[in-house]
Amino acid sequence: MTQAASGIDLFIPEVYDIVWSLIILVIVAVFFYKFFMPKFNAIFDERAAKIQGNIAKAEQARKDADEAKAKYEAQLSTARVDAAKIRDDARAEASHIIADARSRAESDAAQITASAQRSIESQHQQAIVSLKGEVGALATALAGKILGAKLEDNDVQSSMIDSMIDDLGAKK
C-alpha cells in the first residue's frame, strides 16, 4: 500500500495526471483552433465588415447632409441676393413712379394755372369791352345832360368815350 500523502503533497497532483491533462488540453486546443476558431473569425470578420459598412454609410450620409446643407445655404444666399435685388428694383421703380407722378402733377398744375390765367385774361378783356360800352353810353348821356343836348355825331361820341377810358386807365 501506499503511504498517505501529507501536507502540501495533498494539493500537488501526480505526474501522470499532469501529463494526461496536458495531452487532453492540447487535443482540445487543436480541435478548438481547427474547427471553432475559423467560424468565430468568420463571424467576427462579418460583424467587423458590417460595422465598417455602417460607418462608411454614416460617413457618406454625413457628407451628403453636408453637401445638401451647403447647397441649401447657397440657394438661401442666392435667394437673399435676389430678394434684395427685387426690393431695390421695387424701390427704384417706386421712386421713378413717384417722380413721374410728381412731374405730371406739376405739369397739370402749370396747365391749370396757365388756363386759369388765360381765362382771367379773357374775362378781363370781356369786362373791359363791356365796361367800354357801358361807360360810353353813360358818358354820352352825361355829356348830353351837361351840354343840354344829345350828341349825335358818332365820331365825337367815339373820341369822347376813348378819352374817358384813357383817363380811367391812367387813374388805375
Swiss-Prot record:
Family the UniProt entry places it in: Belongs to the ATPase B chain family.
Keywords: ATP synthesis, Cell membrane, CF(0), Hydrogen ion transport, Ion transport, Membrane, Transmembrane, Transmembrane helix, Transport
UniProt KW Transmembrane helix keyword: yes
GO cellular component, one term: proton-transporting ATP synthase complex
Membrane topology value: Single-pass membrane protein
InterPro entries, sorted: ATP_synth_B-like_membr_sf, ATP_synth_b/b'su_bac/chlpt, ATP_synth_F0_bsu_bac, ATP_synthase_B_chain
Organism: Bifidobacterium longum (strain DJO10A)
Cleaved signal peptide residues: none
TM spans (from-to): 18-38
CDD domains the record matches: ATP-synt_Fo_b (cd06503)
Compartments (UniProt record): Cell membrane
Name assigned to this protein: ATP synthase subunit b
